[in-house]
Amino acid sequence: MDGPRSDVGRWGGNPWQPPTTPSPEPEPEPEPERRSRRGGRSFWARCCGCCSCRNRADDDWGPEPHRDRGSGSGRRRPDSRGSDSRRPGSRASGVNAAGDGTIREGMLVVTGVDLLSSRSDQNRREHHTDEFEYDELIIRRGQPFHMVLHFSRPYESSDRVALELLIGNNPEVGKGTHVIIPVGKGGSGGWKAQVTKASGQNLNLRVHTSPNAIIGKFQFTVRTHSEAGEFQLPFDPHNEIYILFNPWCPEDIVYVDHEDWRQEYVLNESGRIYYGTEAQIGERTWNYGQFDHGVLDACLYILDRRGMPYGGRGDPVSVSRVISAMVNSLDDNGVLIGNWSGDYSRGTNPSAWVGSVEILLSYLRTGYSVPYGQCWVFAGVTTTVLRCLGLATRTVTNFNSAHDTDTSLTMDIYFDENMKPLEHLNHDSVWNFHVWNDCWMKRPDLPSGFDGWQVVDATPQETSSGIFCCGPCSVESIKNGLVYMKYDTPFIFAEVNSDKVYWQRQDDGSFKIVYVEEKAIGTLIVTKAVGSNMQDDVTHIYKHPEGSEAERKAVETAAAHGSKPNVYTNRDSAEDVALQVEAQDAVMGQDLTVSVVLTNRGSSTRTVKLHLYLSVTFYTGVTGPVFKESKKEVVLAPGATERVSMPVAYKEYRPQIVDQGSMLLNVSGHVKENGQVLAKQHTFRLRTPDLSLTLLGAAVVGQECEVQIVFKNPLPVTLTNVVFRLEGSGLQRPKILNVGDIGGNETVTLHQKFVPVRPGPRQLIASLDSPQLSQVHGVIQVDVAPAPGGGGFFSNAGGNSPLGETIPMASRGGA
């Protein structure tokens, strides 16, 4: 690939540096309202059936908006978790008349606005936004909502009323950032407002929004015109309106035609992320927390920090691409700093995170990139952001994921004449697993047939158009090897469906293909199943069945567009000895055994010279030095099978072990009789224990309850500086517990209290991290009963104790 490559994205974490991006400035105070004196028709003369008429005289539309009006996030974070009670609307004493500033008798003065924004009101329930821990109105585009206007006198048929929504620094009608909706008039573009009831001094409205509307936080105002004059309601932060994508709206290009999918991929606040190896799959629960207080503002702030034009924020293709760039910190001081070095002393070990909320709120609060993340953290945060904004999104794990660095669309491994790896040439790598995201949308920018799931990958691996982002890329184009479809299809295709090609240096210095491993990449692609915590194998949507004609055609079609289009020609095929690797399923701290099984499938005796090299490996495919090796010659009778075993003691691998507890067995061999080359790379991992969580008593909204956490140290050494994390949407805000040291093989018990703030089934998630042991986590489902009398309860969720609290052990025990 021609663009710059990131050592951070591939494996080497750079030390955390003091960020250069300053904290976001507070939202500026509103400028004094001023009336445009330029010529042209009056506001009401130019107010056609709908503001979407693209009138370009945007600076003549009455009082100018102040800077950062209704910005995508603003720096005013919601300051109340609130109850379901409504705030009083703006009263007459707080209004300003347009024009000379006086309120004349007979003028239609707006004395208040009720946006029906509480969680129990019709709007939030119908728009599936009632779980957001916000008091402001949150709606989804393309779907009507209701409001009530309160006037100083009864509304008359001769009165004219218009609603206005504004977003951005310089709202313009033509860009969709200044929306004007005349009440009672039909309009184009999907915006309109209808009177549903006029009663006394109240006017009930049903407002229709465009299915193509910009997403973000809009400021809202009302204008009126009567014979006595014109009036405009001043902007009020309480009347800000959030507009999101709408997968429930058939006219929205993010529409999803399966309610169970919408419940899972938009509304589910937790999920499972898979890791490890194909043969030893691990799973962890992740708290997405997209409805937690402050998270929506953090998601919109990400778009602001990127400087994304407001006019493009209605396009999910553009929004998802920006998010893929901004969730990592490279180029743009985004959310997370990647680190694969193993040294996390200046931040948080990526394995210690249990969810996205702590990360996003830290970024919103400080404006600084958060240390540290690896692929599953980038993907977990991306799922949170895209679900929060209204895109159906899932977290996907690809086992044996290739990282193609030269656009050959193959994984190339180079050996010398004796089949010893040439590390200075081996730039491609195969990750044990890699985690990315699928999000659902139509692709109007592509030919037909490429709608549906799109890959978005926020892990910084390679540049795309000069920045570290990836996607959205149609899964359909990946499946069929159509690598010329945007965005980043060649790189993603290679991750799931390239072949591992072994090259041997010849006597004249040239290289020859000696073996092609066709089923080594993208061997299993999984995500959490809809409606359950089971795995859902989605390999079939990414690739045709391995070995099928369609799959071979896809690979060869893709390779023809790569940098080595003739890689599939002139291959030798004398292969009658089969090789298989087996590794014992062992727990960290135990001894283990690895084995190679050789089978002679021919009719003649075969003599095999076998070499085994064992090293530790990061999950990204970057290996440490070989710490154990074995050489053996095996004679195989026709049809015979022989097993070659290599025991590995804990004391041998303990000094070498790295993150994820992964090891790589390199096997190479040579058959004397026919020259067949044997080559195999097998990765396996050591399992870590789980935390055991037990709920002590019933969980009720607003009432304190307690959880017990039990952990047994599997290692014979002391764990130092042990840190627990606890988090769960609707249960517990992110909490850090410092517990000190835990002795070798010791069992410890902690008790923690929390106050649930939302009813229903919830997930409470915990993790443990120390320099000696990581990737330890646990989860418990908590079924929360409503508070007596019903209703929501938002009061500093999980705020019982601060971050970084030192917690004494409830009990300690031996092995």
From Swiss-Prot:
EC number: 2.3.2.13
One GO CC annotation: membrane
Record localization: Membrane
Cofactor: binding comment: Binds 1 Ca(2+) ion per subunit.
Catalyzed chemical reaction(s): L-glutaminyl-[protein] + L-lysyl-[protein] = [protein]-L-lysyl-N(6)-5-L-glutamyl-[protein] + NH4(+)
Top EC category: transferase
Active site (UniProt): C375, H434, D457
Function description: Catalyzes the cross-linking of proteins and the conjugation of polyamines to proteins. Responsible for cross-linking epidermal proteins during formation of the stratum corneum. Involved in cell proliferation.
Sequence positions bearing Phosphothreonine: T21
Protein family according to the UniProt entry: Belongs to the transglutaminase superfamily. Transglutaminase family.
Biological processes per GO annotation: keratinization; keratinocyte differentiation; positive regulation of cell cycle; positive regulation of keratinocyte proliferation
Subunit structure comment from the entry: Interacts with PLAAT4.
Presence of keyword Phosphoprotein: yes
UniProt: Ca(2+) binding residues: N497, D499, E546, E551
Cofactor list: Ca(2+)
Keywords: Acyltransferase, Calcium, Keratinization, Lipoprotein, Membrane, Metal-binding, Palmitate, Phosphoprotein, Transferase
PTM: Palmitoylated. The membrane anchorage region possesses a cluster of five cysteines within which fatty acid(s) may become thioester-linked. It is subject to phorbol ester-stimulated phosphorylation and is hypersensitive to proteolysis, which releases the enzyme in a soluble form.
Region feature (Disordered): 1-40, 59-100, 795-815
Official protein name in the record: Protein-glutamine gamma-glutamyltransferase K
Skewed-composition ranges (Basic and acidic residues): 59-87
Organism: Canis lupus familiaris (Dog)
Membrane topology: Lipid-anchor
Compositionally skewed regions (Pro residues) per UniProt: 16-25
